[in-house]
Amino acid sequence: MVSARVVRRVSVLAAIVAILLGIPVQATAAPRPTSGVDDINCQPSAAHPRPVVLVHGTWSNPTKTWEKLAPALRDQGYCVYTISYGKRENASLQNLLDLFGGDSIRESARMLGKFVDTVRAETGAAQVDIVGHSQGAVVARQYMKFDGGTNPANPAANKVNTLVSLAGTNHGTSFNRNQFIGAVGEMLGIPVVRLAALAVGPSYVEQMIGSPFMTALNAGGDTQPGVRYVAVGTRDDNMVTPQERTFLTAGPGATVRNLWVQDGCPTAQVDHMQMTSDPRAVGIVLGALDPAWGRTHPAPCP
């Protein structure tokens, strides 16, 4: 049993390590409910029969991430549900800063699976749509591939109909040169990977280009049969680098639409974190979930 004193001391060390590694950690407040969101009494309508599950990214939380998009979806008549995931597990000596989205992506995907089953049971819906930001898109893809979110032998039994990936780290990222800096540290004998997991959890390293996790996730193709994918990137992304690594390639039985926020609006300036709140990005999500609505309601262009 590790004493609380040891955990506190190591947590201080973890915070120092995070700063030295250049990891952009921000304090995350406990999630607060948004009116009309996460309503167990919400009944999907004929117009929007699938609940929408929102999956935040690394070191964020539902309140911070979805303060604009969740109400916009609610106002369009969707049943909207948000998950918070990836905090430090009891007695674990990883993610000592206890950040949301820090835990292993495999564990977070299993948590998402349980959450989706709860949403389906509460609403009576056979399927959900998922919007995932950054790591959230990868958590969703892991769930769909390995944890029961889809049924390749019988796609009609899929639990997920549509995945909208917002700046997803789908093919790994260099984190704007942090991966290179970490590799140099490892060559110099500094255990950067272990220190990063200690400080902020394993998900950070799992999202890097060429990681064992990314290799396994993308082996055999990016998609699952019967799922509609919309991958939205931004040319201003400083977290998913190179930015094109967010896009997906359709495999058998799946459809993929890849687009930039700047498509049709080259003046749009939207960074990684703004992908869930910028009015144009929000409009793109609404149109992705309801293409018929999107054809008559183009996303605003500043």
Annotated model-derived regions:
Residues E67, S92-N95, G172-Q179, T241-R245, ...:
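Short aromatic-enriched loop/helix-cap "lid" or pocket-rim segments at secondary-structure transitions
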Residues M1-A29:
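Secretory targeting and sorting signals
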Residues G57-N61, G86-N90, H133-V138, K145-F146, ...:
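Solvent-exposed loop/turn segments at secondary-structure junctions
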Residues V200-N238:
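The feature captures the conserved acid-bearing segment of alpha/beta-hydrolase catalytic domains
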Residues H56, V80, D98-F100, R106-T215:
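Serine-dependent carboxylesterase/thioesterase catalytic core
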Residues E186, D222-P302:
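C-terminal catalytic-base region of ester-bond hydrolases, centering on the histidine
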Residues P44-H48, L73-D75, E122-T123, V131-G132, ...:
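Extracellular/periplasmic catalytic domains that process cell-envelope and extracellular macromolecules
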Residues R32, D38-N41, S45-Q127, I181, ...:
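Active-site catalytic motif of lipid deacylating hydrolases and related acyltransferases
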